[in-house]
């Protein structure tokens, strides 16, 4: 699924309120509809306020009063929120690159691990998956099934096993096999449970023993519908595991894709990947301009 298609639900809510003819004039009612549309899409009030102030200044101070020109300014403001630095996955001078996926239950970590493996394999890499979610036997089986489907090797632990030991073994296997990237799926855990976050911290430390400098990325997988709770999750996981970037999932199932701007601005963490569908190919890299254009296309 393309980014444009994946954001259809959010876009439909915005378009219904904003677009008319190319020479449509901006009115107070239209500005009110723009503000409402952004808020309904879950763009944070702290972002909507300055965006709306800029839009009103264009109309009142600069005399720009056509809808397309004002929307161009809004697009530019939203692109700047997402930034352009550090959006690509980090590389490593030492193989294998190690990527840990962390997050709460139900955020889509296991599926994201498989999608990322496919993406890297399609790019010519040799990924290896690590099923380190020992809390749920189903998660191990799910990742093994994905690995078989994608023809990607997988190292799996046993239910109730030590996840840090499994990650260590997975990295060691990646070194032995000459894998380019090891992707470890960790157990879902509440950011409010200190002992579970301590366990995650141990996983990070042990990864560094298996390969100096690992992990290269700690990606927090966030459900795109989580709203303000995503902010609290990110703070907890960053404190425990040193999160380096975000993956926002389930954007195809929500009309609130504006939450991406909220997490990017409030967390000061790069959004690196977006989940826009259920198939293995539906994981796309963040492209700020393409993302904003998918929400507010140039009619």
Go through each PLM region and give its residues:
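Acidic active-site catalytic centers that drive phospho-/nucleotidyl reactions
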Residues: 42, 133, 185, 223, ...
């Amino acid at each position: 699924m393309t980014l444009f298609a994946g954001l259809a639900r959010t876009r439909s809510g915005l378009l219904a309120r904003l677009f008319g003819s190319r020479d449509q004039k901006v009115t107070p009612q239209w500005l009110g509809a723009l503000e409402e549309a952004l808020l309904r899409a879950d763009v944070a009030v702290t972002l909507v306020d300055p965006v709306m102030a800029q839009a009103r200044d264009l109309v009142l101070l600069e005399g720009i009063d056509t809808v397309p020109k004002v929307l161009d300014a809004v697009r530019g403001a939203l692109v700047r929120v997402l930034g352009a630095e550090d959006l690509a996955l980090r590389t490593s001078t030492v193989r294998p690159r190690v990527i840990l996926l962390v997050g709460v239950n139900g955020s889509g970590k296991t599926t994201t691990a498989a999608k990322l493996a496919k993406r890297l394999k399609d790019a010519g890499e040799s990924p290896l998956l690590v099923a380190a979610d020992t809390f749920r036997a189903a998660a191990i089986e799910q990742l093994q099934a994905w690995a078989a489907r994608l023809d990607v090797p997988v190292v799996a632990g046993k239910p109730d096993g030590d996840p840090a030991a499994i990650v260590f073994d997975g990295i060691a296997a990646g070194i032995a096999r000459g894998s380019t990237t090891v992707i470890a799926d960790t157990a879902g855990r509440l950011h409010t449970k200190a002992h579970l976050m301590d366990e995650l911290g141990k996983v990070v430390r042990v990864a560094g023993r298996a390969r100096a400098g690992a992990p290269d990325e700690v990606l927090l997988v966030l459900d795109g519908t989580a709203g303000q709770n995503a902010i609290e999750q990110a703070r907890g996981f960053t404190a425990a595991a040193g999160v380096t970037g975000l993956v926002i999932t389930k954007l195809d199932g929500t009309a609130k894709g504006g939450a991406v701007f909220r997490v990017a601005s409030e967390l000061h963490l790069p959004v690196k990947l977006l989940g826009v569908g259920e198939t293995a190919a539906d994981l796309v890299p963040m492209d700020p301009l393409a993302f904003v254009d998918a929400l507010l296309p140039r009619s």
